[in-house]
């Protein structure tokens, strides 16, 4: 087949590089680095490696703000996943990854391959994946297309996770109009590792072979990384070839084989990395660059499943289920024999060199030869202009929204029927959350908990972000996202350790959006410092806009905590009638950005709820101490829908009721003030609990009752609701909306 690729002259004169994603100034920079004009393959390499998705060129200045260190950190940002220490020589590896753009175009495969990619990131570190979580955003469930997206995304996550045998144990889903054409699909994987097995993605040692393992390379997903770095338009729907197709059974074999190599052949393994965004070029150039080495790759040896593939296509393909290994010279057969046992091919496709060049050979000719650091490290970094949006000042100055509630129980029922609040059982029942049999707390409580085999420990995990608060005030909202994640971990009996962040924003070239990114990072950083949860991994997804309409700022916080003893595991539901109910924290009239404001006004506006990080930290530490001392029967964080929703949720599982008198007016039942916890305590532990909390704003409200009735009293006012009525509304809402 004759080569139909454009010449260097055509690339320059017709500005073909622009179609590939390079700006004029970036193209000039490539020319000056090379001392010549790049050919088509080289232009492709730079365009994809310098995309935002691979280089973080627009977000690097912001990412530098994050605290990334702590005594618990074994591996910070920069590798496939971050790792924290949980004692006993064990670590937990975790990371969140977005697959937003592909999931709009091809929701089943987009979501499935998002799951596959994040699993590879975790096992490339040497960790065995033990759990998956996800954080999803969709538009309102009032159109057939919205329902289709939800059904297909959930089916894709379930199809991949269930097949590979990793439990999907938790997550969150929110519905807002801004996500109608920009759904967000963020997947998080958590793995367990012996600290001695931690791997690096590096290719070093002159002459050491580089091996390609796993599925063959096809034309799927070419320019997936560039596709994720531009705004959507209606034509974007046509870009299906940029969406990859996944095979979870192949991935299961790959996972076991790679962990085998790491466990039993670590002496001959130099480095290992997943082929993710930007495929082979990204994994290979990063591995060489990190080691200060060069690489020579022979494209003829890359396993191909389609005919006449060009070097450009092979290097940029994002075919799934592929890994790159660097091994010591003389041990290729040993590695090949191991992979053969799993029915996988392991092929030498190149070697490490000492000239720091990235050299690509095809049919005996050099088709690309560029400095490896130029690809992997030297992408230009942009300090984008930042400008406060007009809405921010308007929200700050606006009179606070005060709801009019004539019928408290009626509003209560309406809130429980909102899809963001309603039970997600219909969704998570499609996931296998018990496979591997270590899931101690299943979906539906504040955090998921997975036991650590052979110890008395467990790992608590959650994903959180209320993007409405970030729309009102990205700095406060960013801090609240971290605080809420930590609250969920603490309520479950865990000590928060670290976070991974999935930063989903609109187009960074708009100064108002870049301002959102900066402010959100400031808020996240402040909360991480106060709560001692460094950022150890993450992902940035920008350009979440379609036809000029962007999403709310949505930095998803994935957090992991350590439950030091299985006896500390705590869930949100009341356990026994007669238990005493307490509220930790103060309730104010804070409705801006709340589920109630959205319900009554059809929009959100005003000042975000206040967050005092010192108070947050103090309450979290007190509650965790109370749980560890065995004083707490149940605990639940107050989030969307405030006290009213939390109280109802606590009664549902066991079919109990509650008889409480609250220290605030009844229309504040649905206020979303921060730093609050609903706790129940056995009568015999009441005195000890009260003593521990005695100097704080902690209120004894009443007791859990055996009848299925919730009674809430304030002064002379009393409202009464049936637990079973509320529960049937809460459980029935999403199945009904998805019909």
Swiss-Prot record:
Q: Which GO terms describe its cellular component?
A: cytoplasm
Query: Catalytic activity annotated for this protein?
Result: N(2)-formyl-N(1)-(5-phospho-beta-D-ribosyl)glycinamide + L-glutamine + ATP + H2O = 2-formamido-N(1)-(5-O-phospho-beta-D-ribosyl)acetamidine + L-glutamate + ADP + phosphate + H(+)
Q: Which Enzyme Commission numbers does its entry carry?
A: 6.3.5.3
Q: What class of enzyme is it?
A: ligase
Q: Which residues form the active site?
A: 53, 99
**Record localization:** Cytoplasm
Name the SUPFAM superfamilies on file. PurM C-terminal domain-like, PurM N-terminal domain-like
Q: Which UniProt keywords apply?
A: ATP-binding, Cytoplasm, Ligase, Magnesium, Metal-binding, Nucleotide-binding, Purine biosynthesis
Q: Which residues bind ATP?
A: 56, 95, 501, 538
> Where is it predominantly found?
cytoplasm
Q: Which GO BP terms sit in this record?
A: 'de novo' IMP biosynthetic process
State the pathway, as annotated in the record.
Answer: Purine metabolism; IMP biosynthesis via de novo pathway; 5-amino-1-(5-phospho-D-ribosyl)imidazole from N(2)-formyl-N(1)-(5-phospho-D-ribosyl)glycinamide: step 1/2
What does the entry list as the binding residues for Mg(2+) 2? 121, 274
GO MF terms on file?
ATP binding; magnesium ion binding; phosphoribosylformylglycinamidine synthase activity
PANTHER family xrefs: PHOSPHORIBOSYLFORMYLGLYCINAMIDINE SYNTHASE SUBUNIT PURL (PTHR43555:SF1)
Job of this protein: Part of the phosphoribosylformylglycinamidine synthase complex involved in the purines biosynthetic pathway. Catalyzes the ATP-dependent conversion of formylglycinamide ribonucleotide (FGAR) and glutamine to yield formylglycinamidine ribonucleotide (FGAM) and glutamate. The FGAM synthase complex is composed of three subunits. PurQ produces an ammonia molecule by converting glutamine to glutamate. PurL transfers the ammonia molecule to FGAR to form FGAM in an ATP-dependent manner.
**Record note on quaternary structure:** Monomer. Part of the FGAM synthase complex composed of 1 PurL, 1 PurQ and 2 PurS subunits.
Q: Which family does it belong to?
A: Belongs to the FGAMS family.
Q: What is this protein called?
A: Phosphoribosylformylglycinamidine synthase subunit PurL
- Tell me what gene encodes this: purL
């Amino acid at each position: 087949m004759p080569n139909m690729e454009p010449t260097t002259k055509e690339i320059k004169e017709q500005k073909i590089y622009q179609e590939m994603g390079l700006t004029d100034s970036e193209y000039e920079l490539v020319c000056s680095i090379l001392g010549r004009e790049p050919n088509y393959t080289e232009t492709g390499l730079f365009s994809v490696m310098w995309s935002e998705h691979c280089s973080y060129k627009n977000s690097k200045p912001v990412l530098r703000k994050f605290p990334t260190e702590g005594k618990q950190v074994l591996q910070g940002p920069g590798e496939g996943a971050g790792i924290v220490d949980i004692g006993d020589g064990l670590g937990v590896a975790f990371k969140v990854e977005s697959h937003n753009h592909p999931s709009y175009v091809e929701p089943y495969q987009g979501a499935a391959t998002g799951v596959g990619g994040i699993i590879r990131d975790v096992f490339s570190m040497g960790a065995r994946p033990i759990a998956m979580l996800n954080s999803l955003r969709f538009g309102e469930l009032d159109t057939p297309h919205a329902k289709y997206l939800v059904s297909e995304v959930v089916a894709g996550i379930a199809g991949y996770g269930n097949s590979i045998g990793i439990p999907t144990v938790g997550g969150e889903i929110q519905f807002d109009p801004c996500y109608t054409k920009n759904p967000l699909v963020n997947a998080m994987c958590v793995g367990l590792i012996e600290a001695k097995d931690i791997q690096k993605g590096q290719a070093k040692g002159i002459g050491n072979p580089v091996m390609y393992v796993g599925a063959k390379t096809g034309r799927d997903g070419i320019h997936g990384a560039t596709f994720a770095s531009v705004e959507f338009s209606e034509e974007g729907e046509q870009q299906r070839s940029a969406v990859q197709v996944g095979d979870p059974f192949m991935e299961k074999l790959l996972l076991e084989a790679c962990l085998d190599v790491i466990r039993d052949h670590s002496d001959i393994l130099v480095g290992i990395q997943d082929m993710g965004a930007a495929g082979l070029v990204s994994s290979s150039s990063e591995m060489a660059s990190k080691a200060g080495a060069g690489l020579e790759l022979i494209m003829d040896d890359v396993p191909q499943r389609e005919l006449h593939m060009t070097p450009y296509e092979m290097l940029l393909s994002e075919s799934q289920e592929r890994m790159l290994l660097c091994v010591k010279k003389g041990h290729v057969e040993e590695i090949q024999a191991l992979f053969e046992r799993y029915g996988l091919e392991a092929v030498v496709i190149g070697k490490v060199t000492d000239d720091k060049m990235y050299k690509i050979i095809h049919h005996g000719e050099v088709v690309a030869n560029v400095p490896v650091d130029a690809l992997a490290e030297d992408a230009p970094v942009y300090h984008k202009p930042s400008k406060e949006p007009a809405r921010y000042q308007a929200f700050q100055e606006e009179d606070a929204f005060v709801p009019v509630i004539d019928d408290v129980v009626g509003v209560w029922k309406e809130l429980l029927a909102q899809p963001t609040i309603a039970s997600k059982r219909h969704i998570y029942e499609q996931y296998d959350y018990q496979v591997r049999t270590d899931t101690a707390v299943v979906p539906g409580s504040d955090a998921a908990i997975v036991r650590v085999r052979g110890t008395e420990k467990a790992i608590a995990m959650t994903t959180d972000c209320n993007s409405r608060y970030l729309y009102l005030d990205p700095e406060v909202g960013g801090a609240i996202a971290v605080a809420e994640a930590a609250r969920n971990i603490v309520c479950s009996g865990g000590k928060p350790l670290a976070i991974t962040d999935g930063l989903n924003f609109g187009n960074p070239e708009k100064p108002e959006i870049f301002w959102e990114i900066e402010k959100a990072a400031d808020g996240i950083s402040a909360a991480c410092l106060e709560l001692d949860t460094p950022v150890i991994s993450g992902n940035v997804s920008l350009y979440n806009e379609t036809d000029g309409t962007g999403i709310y700022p949505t930095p998803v916080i994935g957090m992991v905590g350590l439950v030091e003893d299985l006896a500390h595991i705590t869930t949100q539901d009341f356990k026994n009638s007669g238990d005493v109910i307490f509220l930790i924290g103060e309730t104010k009239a804070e409705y801006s950005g709340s589920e109630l404001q959205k319900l009554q006004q059809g929009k959100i506006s005003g000042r975000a709820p206040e967050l005092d990080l010192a108070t947050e930290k103090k309450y979290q530490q007190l509650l965790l101490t109370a749980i560890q001392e065995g004083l707490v029967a149940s605990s639940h964080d107050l989030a969307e829908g405030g006290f009213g929703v939390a109280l109802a949720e606590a009664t549902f599982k066991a079919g109990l009721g509650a008889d409480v008198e609250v220290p605030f007016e009844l229309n504040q039942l649905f206020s979303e003030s921060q730093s609050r916890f609903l706790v129940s305590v056995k009568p015999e532990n009441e005195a000890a609990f009260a003593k521990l909390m005695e100097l704080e704003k902690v209120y004894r409200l009443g007791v859990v009752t055996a009848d299925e009735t919730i009674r809430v009293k304030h002064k002379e006012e009393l409202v009464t609701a049936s637990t079973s009525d509320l529960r049937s509304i809460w459980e029935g809402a999403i199945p009904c909306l998805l019909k």
